[in-house]
From Swiss-Prot:
Residues 118-138, 210-235 have a biased composition (Basic and acidic residues). This is Pro-opiomelanocortin. It is found in: Secreted. GO terms for biological process: calcium-mediated signaling; cell-cell signaling; cellular pigmentation; generation of precursor metabolites and energy; glucose homeostasis; negative regulation of tumor necrosis factor production; neuropeptide signaling pathway; positive regulation of adenylate cyclase-activating G protein-coupled receptor signaling pathway. The modification Pyrrolidone carboxylic acid (Glu) is found at E173. The lineage of its organism: Eukaryota, Metazoa, Chordata, Craniata, Vertebrata.
Length: 265
């Protein structure tokens, strides 16, 4: 019984080994060493005879022995269909992975260190061109800044500086001050006094208007449509006019007299 069990297990092991390749299995079945598999020695001899051809036909690799090795770099195989994987080369000739990136950096450094003066203009030029190329079709691609206005050229340099430093609303004051400086100190004193009187007059007028508003009485809502309704529409039209208004006692007396007169009749 033990021999039969060992022969059966050996036959199963041999069958599993021979399933890997049809050519190897056919050669082993035709050989004389594999004709009699009843004994353990014949079984081991058959396995030893078939093992070299089996390893030659289907080489065993570490890890997944049943799979063939990848013919290409895994990263290139997976990412080669993306346009940014080629690093600017045509037909995928650039090396993928870290080597391609390092090669590209070396090329950029070599171009930067080439002959010719290096300055800020040389560095910022390509970047600005690249940005305008990529963002020119968007309306927000260009940065929003102040509108460019035509530069006014003045014959005098001082006028040009004052026009650029101060807005339009201060130009009159600047011209007035220049005229006063040209006249002399007496003219400056007179103009200062005139300004003080003008300011004092404006303040006095504002205070007078405020006092008149306070003395005029309670606040009236004349700017609202319900502030002052017409007299004929007050109280729901009960009081139509001032002439028809009579004391309430007189109305009651007249009503009593009319009722008594009707009862007497």
């Amino acid at each position: 019984m033990p021999r039969l069990c060992s022969s059966r297990s050996g036959a199963l092991l041999l069958a599993l080994l021979l399933q890997a390749s049809m050519e190897v299995r056919g050669w082993c079945l035709e050989s004389s060493q594999c004709q009699d598999l009843t004994t353990e020695s014949n079984l081991l001899a058959c396995i030893r005879a078939c093992k070299p051809d089996l390893s030659a036909e289907t080489p065993v690799f570490p890890g997944n022995g049943d799979e063939q090795p990848l013919t290409e770099n895994p990263r290139k195989y997976v990412m080669g269909h993306f346009r940014w994987d080629r690093f600017g080369r045509r037909n995928g000739s650039s090396s993928s992975g870290v080597g391609g990136a390092a090669q590209k950096r070396e090329e950029e450094v070599a171009v930067g260190e080439g002959p010719g003066p290096r300055g800020d203009d040389a560095e910022t030029g390509p970047r600005e061109d690249k940005r305008s190329y990529s963002m020119e079709h968007f309306r927000w691609g260009k940065p929003v800044g102040k509108k460019r206005r035509p530069v006014k050229v003045y014959p005098n340099g001082a006028e040009d500086e004052s026009a650029q430093a101060f807005p339009l609303e201060f130009k009159r004051e600047l011209t007035g001050e220049r005229l006063e400086q040209a006249r002399g100190p007496e003219a400056q004193a007179e103009s200062a006094a005139a300004r003080a009187e003008l300011e004092y007059g404006l303040v006095a007028e504002a205070e007078a208007e405020a006092a008149e508003k306070k003395d005029s009485g309670p606040y009236k809502m004349e700017h609202f449509r319900w502030g002052s309704p017409p007299k004929d529409k007050r109280y729901g039209g009960f009081m139509t006019s001032e002439k028809s208004q009579t004391p309430l006692v007189t109305l009651f007396k007249n009503a009593i007299i009319k009722n008594a007169h009707k009862k007497g009749q």
